[in-house]
């Protein structure tokens, strides 16, 4: 018996209940209670299940049933609310401009689909007279796209009127519109387009009339009378020589006859003052001597009227007073070509103009 009792006790103790565990372990009980108390003080209590789950509320069944009943009752009544806007759409009447668009040969997208202004009026439900009057004006833009075909008689009369007066007063415009079987708007638009065409034509004609001013300015720049005012420096002197080459007939005769001094003296002074010009005049690209036979063969040239005395011995005499580079070019055996000789003579004439 004792064995069985102990066995039973051991069986019971082998599977203790939760209450026995809590009573046998007071520390666990205290920690459980204190932790639950702390959590209850720190964390706000959650809402009751009745609030989180409305169906658990005592009156939820009674409240939700009426809602469901109301929804069931409103369900068949949902289509009727859209019909109120539908009756509002017919109040927008069909204006004449709508019919014109539909009957036009090239119907635009606005003819098939209502315009924004027309759709805005039914949506807002405002049928004021001002909005109704504004619709034809909005559609007037579509009507203006249609091109008006004027007859020859109408064009002739309009051109005649435009010739006398480019701007029409309203009484005259009404009179012409009635005479030509046109609307006042068509006459006004035709005159606007005709004025723009006239403006373009006059603008294209003006540039040719204003062009002659440019050549005159160029003539003033290239006037040979301003050449003596050039400075004796190298670049300006070379530019003057180049301009003298461009106008040899105008420069050479007057230059040679204006200064009675011998050419040798003039050449010596020019070589001492501006060696750059003298070097270029002496054929800086292909230097060579000035033999006597070259001048004898070129005496008939109009550019050499006063060079008969310019012989080889005079060149040797002049070489002493010229720069070393010019002297070397005179001693070179390479002969001058005719083009280089012409350039040389014209350069000498330009130097005479700079140093009178």
UniProtKB/Swiss-Prot annotation:
Gene expressing this chain: HOXB2
Amino acid composition bias (Low complexity), ranges on this chain: 106-136, 227-240
Phosphoserine sites (modified residues): 274
Molecular-function annotations in GO: DNA-binding transcription activator activity, RNA polymerase II-specific; DNA-binding transcription factor activity, RNA polymerase II-specific; RNA polymerase II cis-regulatory region sequence-specific DNA binding; sequence-specific DNA binding; sequence-specific double-stranded DNA binding
Subunit: Part of the nuclear protein complex gamma-globin promoter and enhancer binding factor (gamma-PE) composed at least by SATB1 and HOXB2.
Source organism of this protein record: Homo sapiens (Human)
GO biological process: anterior/posterior pattern specification; dorsal/ventral pattern formation; embryonic skeletal system morphogenesis; facial nerve structural organization; morphogenesis of an epithelial sheet; nervous system development; neural nucleus development; positive regulation of transcription by RNA polymerase II
Compositional bias segments (type: Pro residues): 77-94
Subcellular location, record wording: Nucleus
Residue ranges for the DNA-binding region feature of this UniProt entry: 143-202
PANTHER family assigned to the protein according to its UniProt record, in alphabetical order: HOMEOBOX PROTEIN HOX-B2 (PTHR45664:SF7), PROTEIN ZERKNUELLT 1-RELATED (PTHR45664)
Similarity-based family: Belongs to the Antp homeobox family. Proboscipedia subfamily.
Start and end residues of each stretch annotated as Disordered: 39-142, 197-240
Motif Antp-type hexapeptide, residue range(s) on this chain: 94-99
Pfam families the UniProt entry points to: Homeodomain
Biased composition (Polar residues): 52-66
Record key words, sorted: Developmental protein, DNA-binding, Homeobox, Nucleus, Phosphoprotein, Transcription, Transcription regulation
One Gene Ontology term, aspect cellular component: nucleoplasm
Protein name: Homeobox protein Hox-B2
Known role: Sequence-specific transcription factor which is part of a developmental regulatory system that provides cells with specific positional identities on the anterior-posterior axis.
């Amino acid at each position: 018996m004792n064995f069985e009792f102990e066995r039973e006790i051991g069986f019971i103790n082998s599977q203790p209940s939760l209450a026995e565990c809590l009573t046998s372990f007071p520390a666990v009980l205290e920690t459980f209670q204190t932790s639950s108390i702390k959590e209850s003080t720190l964390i706000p209590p959650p809402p009751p299940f009745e609030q989180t789950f409305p169906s658990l509320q005592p009156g939820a069944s009674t409240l939700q049933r009426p809602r469901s009943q109301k929804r069931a009752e409103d369900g068949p009544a949902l289509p009727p609310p859209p019909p109120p806007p539908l009756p509002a759409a017919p109040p927008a009447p069909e204006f004449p401009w709508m019919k014109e668009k539909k009957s036009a040969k090239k119907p635009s997208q606005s003819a098939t689909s209502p315009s924004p202004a027309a759709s805005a009026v039914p949506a807002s439900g405002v049928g004021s007279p001002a909005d109704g009057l504004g619709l034809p004006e909005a559609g007037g833009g579509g009507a203006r796209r249609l091109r008006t075909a004027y007859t020859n008689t109408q064009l002739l009369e309009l051109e005649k009127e435009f010739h006398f007066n480019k701007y029409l007063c309203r009484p005259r415009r009404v009179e012409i519109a009635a005479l030509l079987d046109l609307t006042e708007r068509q006459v006004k638009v035709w005159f606007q387009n005709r004025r723009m065409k006239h403006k373009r034509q006059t603008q294209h004609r003006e540039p040719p009339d204003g062009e002659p001013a440019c050549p005159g300015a160029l003539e003033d720049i290239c006037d040979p009378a301003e050449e003596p005012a050039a400075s004796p420096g190298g670049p300006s002197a070379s530019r003057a020589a180049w301009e003298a080459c461009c106008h040899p007939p105008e420069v050479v005769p007057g230059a040679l006859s204006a200064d009675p001094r011998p050419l040798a003296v003039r050449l010596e002074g020019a070589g001492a003052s501006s060696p750059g010009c003298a070097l270029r005049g002496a054929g800086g690209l292909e230097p060579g001597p000035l033999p006597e036979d070259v001048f004898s063969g070129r005496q008939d040239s109009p550019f050499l009227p006063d060079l008969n005395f310019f012989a080889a011995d005079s060149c040797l005499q002049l070489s002493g007073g010229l720069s070393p580079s010019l002297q070397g070019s005179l001693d070179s055996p390479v002969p001058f070509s005719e083009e280089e000789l012409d350039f040389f003579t014209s350069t000498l004439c330009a130097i005479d103009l700079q140093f009178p």
